[in-house]
Amino acid sequence: MSRLRILQVWVATAVLSTGLAVVPGMAAGSTRTFTGKVSDAMCGAKHTEAGIAPADCVRACVQKGAKYALVVGDKVYTLSTSDQAALDTLNKLAWEQAKVTGTATGDTIAVKSVTSVAK
């Protein structure tokens, strides 16, 4: 491959990469709303302890130090927040559907707000 062709491929790749990084809503670190079931990071989508309701399991795991999580389809996001109002809402919505607005980085959502999903 000639040097000119290598340069052309490199420039095209750089332009495409830069363009994709600035597409609104696609950039890493952008705020979005996730809808899913409130759980905990220890159990995720599976609460298998016999004799305990899933909502009670979520609360027990969080009380033992686990973080809240949001199950969205097959994906489990760990929820990160120190806001007491958000934590209280997550506790109230244990094992229920919720809308969580925040910034996702990998498998963690930095929570900005939590609301119930109207039934």
Functional labels for PLM-detected ranges:
Residues 1-6:
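N-terminal secretory signal peptides that target proteins for export/translocation
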Residues 9-22:
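Bacterial N-terminal signal peptides
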Residues 23-119:
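Conserved RNA-binding domains used in RNP assembly and mRNA/RNA metabolism
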